Amino acid sequence: MLSVLWVLISWINISGPIPNISGSLTLFGLYYGFLAALPIGLSQILTIRAFLLGGNTGGTLAVSGSIMGQLITNLSIYYWPIYVMLLKPHAITLLVLPYMLFYWYRTKDLLYDQPPNPVESLNDAQVRQIFLDSFILSLLNPVILPSPVFARSLNLFIFRYSNKISFVISSSFGWLGGYILFINLIKLLMVRIERDSSVNYPLIKSIINQIFSIIILALRLLYLGRAPVPLFTKKIHDGFESDENQIVKSLWLNKPWPTVLFDYRKWNRPFRYIQNGPNGDSPVKKQVSQYFFDTCSSDGRQRISFTSLPSSSTFQKDLKEYLNISEISPSSEDIYDKWIHIEEKRKNNSNDGLTNRVQALDNRFLMINVTEYRNELCDHKENVSIKTYDPFLNKGFRGKIAISESPWIFDEKPLESTRRQIMLNISKRNNKLKDWIYICWQGLERKKLSLPWEPLTPDAFNSFNLIAKEVSNDEEPRTDLKQVDFYEEQTLVTLDEQNISSELFATVTEHTNDLHERTTTKSSINWEHVLNLSSKKRDYYSRYLENIKWHKLLNYWKKLFLDSSTKVRDTLFLITQAFGIRNEYQVQDVVKEMPRWTSKLANYKFDVIGITFSDVRYRKLKNFDYVFETVDQEIEIETNEPFRIVKRFSQQSDFRRNLVIGSMRARRRKTLIWNSLQLKTHSPFFLRIMDETTPLKIPLKVSNKIDTKSTFTPFTKIKQGLIPFFSDSDDEKVFAAEKTELDRLTIANKWDFASAHWGRGFPLVIQSYLRKYVVIPVLIISKNISRILLFQVPEWKEDWNEWSKEIHVKCNYDGTEVSVHQLPSLWHREGLQIKILYPFHLKPWHNSKLRQLEFLDNLDIKNFGDGDEIEKTLLYDGIKDSYTSAERKKIDYSYLTIWGNQTDSPFGNTKKQPFFWKPVIKELRKKRKRILSKITQNFKIYYKFFPLGQKSNIYNESDVPAVSKTRADKSKNNDIFEFEPDDKDKNEERDFKINNEIFDELPIGITPKSSNNLSLQNSNKIEYGTGVFTRESGNDVTPNSNEIERITKHFFDEVQTNTDSKVISDEYPNDGKKLKLRKILIKFYQQIIRLRRKSTQLIHERINSINIFSEEINRNVLKNIFYLIRFKIKLMINFVKNIFINCNEVIHSYNNIFRLQTKYDKYVNQDLIVSGKEGQDPEFNSDQGIDSVSQADVFHGVRQSKTINKSYLKNFLKYWNLYYFIGENYEKKLKVILDEKGILGVGEPQNLSEENWKDWLRCLHRCKLPSHIWCKIVPRTWKNEVTKHWKMEENFPNHFDEDIPHTFMTYSSWERIGKLNRRHKYNLLSYSYLDFAKNREIKKFPMWQSEGEQTIFNNRIREIRECQSVNNEENDKSKIYFEFKMKLWLFPELMKAKKVFGSEVILIPEISLIAEKHNKSLKDERLLEDRECHESIYQWRRTSKELERIVKKLRDIAFLTIIIENQDKFVSLPANIVENLEALVFSTRGDSVKETFQNLEFRLPRVLDDQILMYKTISTLLKFKNRFKRRLDLNTFDESIPRIEIVKNGGKTISSSYFNLEDILLPKRRMELRILNSPDLKGDENRDAELDRGTFGIKRQSYEQLIEEDRDSANKNQIIKRFLRPSYRLEDPACMNRFWFHTNNGSRFAMLRICMYPSIHD
């Protein structure tokens, strides 16, 4: 709803200026009315309760009370006493809690069997109760709500638009409509409850009543949490003892409202304690500025002033009350008309003075005679006195006088004492107003207020005398004289001066002593002297008098209890007098002292532990305990041993740290509604940061192991990269440990709150007791009984010993051991951990070493001999030492969880418990292996005794091992099949190895290492790819060279033996058959082995080839991806760089082109001269056509061209200006020019490069502008230089008197110049708002000029344009004259140091726009000649303007002819061509030279000459004296209207557009005139007339006439800006705020803050 409200307000503000504003306010009022009635608050809940319990009559009464409360709230806006009485925060704060407590107490005891009776008539006793409850709760609704922003916002809106009658009426209808809708909804709810409820309706009423009482109690508790009443707090007793002479503090009843209950200076309720500094200076501010708002007269109207004195406001109100001055009705005559008349008269006088000065300028008066001068004090010889003794200057510009330290020199008496003596004498004279006020005061018997001229009472006189003595008896001088003296403005010394001389302090002491002597006479001291005291002294004096009267009241009360004859009337009179004391002295300043807390609070620099008497809360601790250093075997604490303190701070947000105990708490802000119970408060601003995931940071050890060369890897690379996270090596456990630590801390922080500790602590303790005393004993008993049943020896002793070693240590939440028998303190709030030392693990049997140790312990040593005893002892000690060393090597411990599991650390990973049946299964496997080994051994024995076993020794048991086990080792280092022999033959066959050459004859289960080497071609790929299949292992079968020879020889020998045995086979037929059968079986086994070998090779080869192929693909893909990313990045960087470079070049080029095209077309077109008969060639010359084309026209044609499916040459020629071309077929000729310069070779105009444009520009000599034209391209810079010139002239004094000594002036000349600069800056700052036409049109002059002046300037411009074209009839040789202009001697390096006639044309090749090497070299060659030559330069000037115009035409024609004849030397044109030509023509003039020219010869200044520098330094001071006698020749076509055109003594009429009219006035008069013209003293009816009349008395012109005259070149915005005066701008008064309104906050816009809301006009 609030969002809808803001949108509606924005719509109203936007639609405010339109005529339909009343309709929008009506809609907004209706919306506001519904919002004020419909939200469910406490009053609405009470209305629902009244309808449900009291019927329709009770509900109607509740609604009436709610409407009445809303009406009172709205009336409080119009009538402030209602707001003070009912709605003021101080009063309503005290009323809320008692009323809610009373209401809750009244509704809580209603029984279920006594439901409330409905209200049937208005005579019922419940009528008044329901109405008052609804009325009061509607008033308290904005306070009781948990978040009253909505209700207060509505009140703010109605306060904003309370002056709109349409809004008030519509909001009233909105309230009524909202309440009617609310009543109908309640009735519908009642019907639904009666119809749908299955419970008895009276019982429902009782339940509703009980629920409502609960709601009231909850809201009351919420209110207590929000704003507790600061009545009963913990006092902080200060250690200082009160002095006997100290004034007794006023009692509680003497304090005014609301300070009596809500005192912001309540020293015993600080929020945070800030300790004083080492020097006793507290960082807390001692006082702050406090604004006092009051009405005052400003600009002829009543306005709000925030710098008014409370004393003056109080005196004005009391004087109006006692003199019965009635309020002046709005219909009567305005009391400020006299002030308006005076200010209007001053404004008219100032305007008339300025008008007269302007008219004098129009009448050909010199500006030096018209300009206003400052009056200065001088003697009869016109010697101006120094500024220190000039009374016409303010004291800020006089400087400060350095008082001599010599005791023989005495200063004169300050002028302030003389002024005060005069003021005292004037006050003694008769004053008619004073007598009249005194008579009226005596007639009305108003003795409560003392008049200023009345003498002091005896008590007041004694107090004043006491203060004077205290000031005069000070031993040490104070640096702040305003604290010493009683008067506000005694001396000129400011507050920031740190030292003061003894003589000045002696003067002050003499003055205070004189004041003390004058106070001895009772008649000379009155209340006016008290008012002249400083603010602090006045306040101290008033409090002193107040305490004196309070002492009198206390003495009277003592007599009252002692004397029973005192009347009640006297008592009431004294009480009234006591409470009226503070109304008599209300003289205060606008500075409010800040509360200062006591510095005796017990506070320490660090968070001290174990101290309970501190006055400041320290950081919240948790798990605080004492850890003892000496612990026995059972970890029992010995109280006599030393201990150390272990402290750990809470991880939760600690909002009460550094708070003074007993101080008021602040609410937790920036908390979301759904996170009100969260552990750590986070503002919504930081929620988005919490949602961002933190990237995983791989440790350095792990990152070094991961192969960064191939990121996209197959299974082999993934195995190398990820297996280290889960491997068992020491280096590879680092990452897993760090990752687990992070997760463990996260879980611990999530469970670190009180409710979780309650739910976790109890199950943890129960699990500890169950494990120690239930589970483990049951397992021990079951195990030993099972051993007995299995006819094994029970192990009762071993098991119970291990059970007794298991110790459960109670620890803090972070795992710090505390105690074995006791739980930590506050374990249910701060958490608990249980650490198990030597945890018990149930085993089926114990270790053999333990058994040997126990067996040896049970042996009797006496039964052995000496040798046996030594051997037995050594055996016993060795076994025991080995066991104890293994036991002490590492203490086994774990932490218990609530599920009974064990972890290695709190909230860590679950430890893997040893499996009980694992030793049993292992033992069974060993037995099975042993049985199989015996069977194999028996088979071997049987085979040895076989009859044919001795003849056929091919596979003897000594050579061929028995096949006992074939397994595949799947470890990470072995990927081949490995043969594992029997335990018995393991040592014999460890060195048995084979070769790949006789692999066909090998039995099953043996695979050589060479079988892994697939081929020479793939071996390198395998090693590069994974490196797994080529790794050597200790378990691989590797053949030996000697063994290979022996086995081969033995094999062939056995084969030969078998062939020899064929002869004998006939004798033994059965043996031959068996041998053949064995050979067949062997061959069959060989084929199987060969097949398995091939299949294994194929599988390995396939896998390796796949891995190698995928590795190559991934490596190539990764490389290409990196190349692609790198290429894109480089491409993007180059693209952005080129964009910026091209944009800068284009912008720079277009800016220069636009300036040349729009502002300086006059100078560009001067050289465009077309000859008719003479010098005209029938053939078109390309360079001649180029010179006839302007650069601006070229760029303009390119911009206007359309490049889509068309040739830009046609569009270029379409928009071309035909005026610049000669003859016919200009398109063809222009095409030839463009083709020669390489412009047509480009496909599109936007593809033209910089070189193309440079080639084009090199053909245009008009693009090389001289320096006097470039100075006008940047007029703002030129104007700034002129402004600097004026600053330099104003900074130096007008006259320097050497006869008067200046030893007492401590201000240096540099400081005085800085002050004058600041003054000039302020004047320009205020006037800059009038310089509004900085970018005005060139073709038209300022609109506020007269018609006659406009005509003169238009004619002049027309003449200039006519000079651009030359007719053939005017080319008469008799009219050939030359013009010589030597301008801009500020740049002597651009001129040639020789005797020539200087001309503008000579300067053109020296400052070309395109910097060429030839010009640079030419300049370097002439540099030495220019520095050494100091000859005179002759300059001539024509006496006739017409002669100059004709000579200029002919000179341009001659110059054009020279250019055509010397095309190759066009760029670097020699300077002597035109000089020689002019000398030739000059020689033809003969005797007419003297009549035509004026000699203006001068010498070039030396660059390095001390005399010249000295002259320039001294002449600067002379410029200020003759500042109006030098002419600053500026261009007519400057951008700004205000210009400085200072006329020479020749006397010539100047226009007001060439200079600043306000320069003829002094800065002080300028500002006065501007401020007097700003206020609208006569209203808005004469505003149009003022605008038509103009500012400086110029001829009036209406808006219509101005628009008609300037229709083509100016728009309406320019017209409005040029007539806009500072009275319609806020910036001008804002800039003058600090100087005219005396604000002290340093902000220029302080006055603008008074208007808090924008106004909406009907």
Curated annotation (Swiss-Prot):
SS bond list: none
Biological-process GO terms, alphabetical: protein transport
One CC-aspect GO term: chloroplast inner membrane
Bilayer topology term: Multi-pass membrane protein
Cited InterPro entries: TIC214 (IPR008896)
Signal sequence extent: none
Coarse class of the protein's main subcellular location: plastid
Transmembrane segments: 28-48, 52-72, 82-102, 130-150, 165-185, 199-219
Keyword Hydrolase attributed: no
Keywords from the UniProt entry: Chloroplast, Membrane, Plastid, Plastid inner membrane, Protein transport, Transmembrane, Transmembrane helix, Transport
Xref: Pfam families: Ycf1
Top-level taxon in the UniProt lineage: Eukaryota
Subcellular locations according to the entry: Plastid, Chloroplast inner membrane
PANTHER family, alphabetized: PROTEIN TIC 214 (PTHR33163:SF40), PROTEIN TIC 214-RELATED (PTHR33163)
Family as reported in the entry's similarity comment: Belongs to the TIC214 family.
Role according to the record: Involved in protein precursor import into chloroplasts. May be part of an intermediate translocation complex acting as a protein-conducting channel at the inner envelope.
Subunit field text: Part of the Tic complex.
UniProt protein name: Protein TIC 214
Species this chain originates from: Huperzia lucidula (Shining clubmoss)
